[in-house]
Amino acid sequence: MAALHTTPDSPAAQLERAEDGSECDPDQEEEEEEEEKGEEVQEVEEEEEEIVVEEEEEGVAEVVQDAQVEAVAEVEVEADVEEEDVKEVLAEEECPALGTQERLSRGGDAKSPVLQEKGLQASRAPATPRDEDLEEEEEEEEDEDEDDLLTAGCQELVTFEDVAVYFSLEEWERLEADQRGLYQEVMQENYGILVSLGYPIPKPDLIFRLEQGEEPWVPDSPRPEEGDIVTGVYTGAWFWTDDIEDHEEEDDEDFLAEVAEEENEPPGLWSAAYGVGDVPGTWGPDDSDSAQTPEGWGPDPGGLGVLADGSEAKPFLPGREPGANLLSPWAFPAAVAPPAGRPETTCDVCGKVFPHRSRLAKHQRYHAAVKPFGCEECGKGFVYRSHLAIHQRTHTGEKPFPCPDCGKRFVYKSHLVTHRRIHTGERPYRCAFCGAGFGRRSYLVTHQRTHTGERPYPCSHCGRSFSQSSALARHQAVHTADRPHCCPDCGQAFRLRADFQRHRRGGGCAEAGGDGPRREPGETAAAAGPEDTDPGPEGSEVGEADGEAEAAAEEREEAAVAAPTPSGKVDPAPERRFLELGNGLGEGEGPSSHPLGFHFPVHPKSWLHPDSFPILGLPDFRERLPVDGRPLPAPLGGPLSLVEGTGLACDPFGGGGAAGGGGGLRAFGPAIGGLLAEPAPAALAEEESPWICSDCGKTFGRRAALAKHQRYHAGERPHRCADCGKSFVYGSHLARHRRTHTGERPFPCPECGARFARGSHLAAHVRGHTGEKPFVCGVCGAGFSRRAHLTAHGRAHTGERPYACGECGRRFGQSAALTRHQWAHAEEKPHRCPDCGKGFGHSSDFKRHRRTHTGEKPFRCADCGRGFAQRSNLAKHRRGHTGERPFPCPECGKRFSQRSVLVTHQRTHTGERPYACANCGRRFSQSSHLLTHMKTHRGATAAPGSGSAPAPAPKPEAAAKGPSSAGPGERGSALLEFAGGTSFGSEHQAAFAGPSGAYREGVL
């Protein structure tokens, strides 16, 4: 202790005398002289310290002062207040005999963390000569300050970010070389001090850059608000900043709407709904303080640094081991248990831990619903000043982030980063299930719902659930009928801002100088038709993205199937005159429990008029069918419906006639099943789609979509498979094709574990477990689990057979039937029966044939127990029990249980006799009558005792193909197929017209 007594009245000497209880020197004059000397020494020290500080500040550029002044202010206040509290407690415990004046004097010499930092810088300056007593006293006080720092460190968790300062590129370039060196040395020394003190902190990104010799500037470092420091949390694999601009949002309006919704929602709503923080970009209820992780969270499966909450993540830097520190206890400082003795830094509502009380106070504003920062323009309140600054850009129109490639400007930095991926082609977000790449994290999240079946956005009116918030917003407009976006020139109103913008820029407004339809003054805005076209996932700012929306949209279309609506009714709202197949639930039901309840995307060709569908009832319907793209006559009998897969199109608003200006229907193929017609021009004008294909007239909402579509006309297929050389128009089609080579099946069945290469195949397979048949025939009521099956079934009513054999000309209603038939022409028949030697080209035909030898009848009737060798025969037999007669005659109304019987019956009305005898020319309406008649010729031609066998009867197929198979004016009948595979009749189809409103796609 004696070695510390450099001066008679040093603090250590005073403490020793106070503990020993010794009396002061009786000589008052000497004591006063000593005090005066101490005061003089203290003044000299203060002056020297001020000189050192001034010299240091003069050596730093003005921009450095601007970047640090606000940060220093808050740290000094917080550190001074906290250190004063700690020092008072220590002084009371260790030095109870000291007076108030002495403790204040001692506390006043303590240095704040910022001053300590500056002291580190000042230590390099040449020291002013001083006497040995003053130097020893200063060393003693520095030792005491270090002890105080260690004591404070035990009370508070200090991070590198508390003392770190960041520079933007512009600020860094303005620094001189010696200033940059000084900054680098100070930052490295600060980090070394914290590590030497035993703080469990990882190596920050800034220090890692300095060690690698890289420049430590931060891209577009924002100006910190008053009282705040630009800080972040290093998670071991990424440096996660809490700048709200880094949140990836769809567009400006959506982002501000989400911020507003978040501020009005009760705490914990985000966490309960999505497993993330209350504010986008956090794991906890607040985005400004820390990053908490949910239980079991780990690195991204694809290793690409994708956080589940949407915050920007920097990729792994070269030379650093990926994921080495990801799950370390110090990787999430906010999740570490609060230090003992600091209950004031722990939120008593949610339990979050904060390094400073000021941050805790800010965080508690969320729980208290305090919004001290109000917008002067609209009066909206915000919890943080940075939120207000971002909101004010909506009033000022400021877009401070320009694209260096195309010059387009953005309000948010994250939007610029996302937009630049259009130019670079970068797709950093990969699906862990199928490997699909996306330019936005939100697209990846939406895409992954096709694998998980998640529909987190339920409608509060009808209970229907959606996988995207934008789809829910469009759906809710049906309930509210709200059209807030009104054109100032023509008065036409729109539900969506994107539709309104397309209307303004696409020339659809006649009053504004466009060539669009001009509405009458008395016409209401609601008559404009639906504006439910999907603006696309890009939103208004990245509408021309080359491949991002393509992959997401095509994946949704691939897995586009949802839980059925048992009511089978069309949406009664007159505004929604389009067909939505499998969009979840009907009216009044709860959220869908279907494991693959995907939302079917609304397509412009999915119009369905809620009234009748009389086109098939027209007597001359067959004559009006177009050939090679010729337009159909307009007045076909009223409003029609476009049924996807049948190629029938109509005016969706009942104006398809000549008076309605519909312009008629247009078809693009020789047969119904191959047609894909477009809505009438009136409907196109009301959809407000500005991009029109000059070759086929098809319209698109985005220029990029039109450019991709035109590849079909140009024959361009830029995406080629490296294995087989097959080319594709879209990259997503190539990726899907690649699965045939790799054997990848990324879609597993949750019931049986079977895996599929396409989501649509999985969805159809799942319906086999659930028994769903959402596609219902409007003629006979038959249900089907796949749309293709319904389309093929519809041809049984229309008599359409679009698939023709190139060898014999025989036509089929299904491509699979044509494929099986073509095996008959091929020499190769790999499946040969061991009993009779008959060969088959298809395994299914071989299996059916084998049942004739084995007598196997695996399909049994549940009512009578009768067995059948084929499922179709069982279905026909079941109609005998149920009394079902799904095939009505359009002439007399008589109904039949089998289509073949109906075809035979129709010949009684038409007088058709397609089966002719080759010997006498007599004609018959049924093949059985011809076979009976042939027996008379066989008995007459066989002379008794001649020994010659009777002449074999000509094959019905040959007779049917002959020129005499149909008389003049007769069109022939539909092919009559028997169970044995024999077909009778001509290749010409009978004129068959279904009843009024007979055939359309419906949904259970």
From Swiss-Prot:
Record domain KRAB: where: 158-229
Compartments, as annotated in UniProt: Nucleus
Annotated region described as Disordered, given as residue ranges: 1-148, 508-574, 936-976
Primary location group: nucleus
Modified-residue entries (Phosphothreonine), positions: T7
A Gene Ontology cellular-component term: nucleus
Zn finger spans (C2H2-type): 345-367, 373-395, 401-423, 429-451, 457-479, 485-512, 691-713, 719-741, 747-769, 775-797, 803-825, 831-853, 859-881, 887-909, 915-937
Covalent cross-link Glycyl lysine isopeptide (Lys-Gly) (interchain with G-Cter in SUMO2) as placed by the record, residue numbers: K829, K955
Domain of life: Eukaryota
Ranges of compositional bias, category Low complexity: 61-72, 939-968
Residues bearing the modification Phosphoserine: S10, S112
A GO term for molecular function: sequence-specific DNA binding
UniProt biased composition (Acidic residues): 21-60, 73-95, 132-148, 531-557
Gene Ontology biological process terms in this record: regulation of transcription by RNA polymerase II
S-S bonds: none
Residue(s) carrying N-acetylalanine: A2
Keyword Transmembrane helix among record annotations: no
Signal peptide: none
Entry's family note: Belongs to the krueppel C2H2-type zinc-finger protein family.
PANTHER family, alphabetized: ZINC FINGER AND BTB DOMAIN-CONTAINING (PTHR24399), ZINC FINGER PROTEIN 358-RELATED (PTHR24399:SF68)
Protein task: May be involved in transcriptional regulation.
Name of the protein in question: Zinc finger protein 316
Organism: Homo sapiens
